[in-house]
Amino acid sequence: MLGILLAFICLWLTLIPPAFAADLANGAAVFEARCVGCHVNGGNIVRRNKTLKQKALQKFGMDSIEAVEAIVTNGKNNMSAYKDKLTEEQIHDVAAYVLDRAAADWRS
């Protein structure tokens, strides 16, 4: 019985979506170091309608881990590219953090 339980747990762990496998604490640290200057509390001081709030992310098709990772990696318009400044893991973590905070409306 214990073997079946362990097998089930191992299988379940392999099925965890990448956003949940991210290190949100690391994502928060990256966000504080690199993003908060323009995106304090999920806002946007450069383009006020393109915030990191859930509604705006959905409106602009940025509400998936892949979309946020792509814009962090490659940048777009006034958004700087971070592919040469952050590791893939940091990009994944900060993208997951952004989506997590957006889902919580940037409240603690």
Language-model features: where?
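Post-cleavage N-terminal segment of exported redox proteins
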Residues: 1-23, 100-108
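Short N-terminal micro-motifs specific to bacterial/archaeal maturation
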Residues: 12, 18, 58-59, 82-85
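Hydrophobic alpha-helical segments
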Residues: 18, 24-25, 72, 92
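Short pre-active-site segment immediately N-terminal to redox-active cysteine/selenocysteine motifs
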Residues: 23, 31-37, 42, 75-78
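Axial heme c-ligation environment in periplasmic c-type cytochrome domains
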Residues: 46-55, 71-102, 106-108
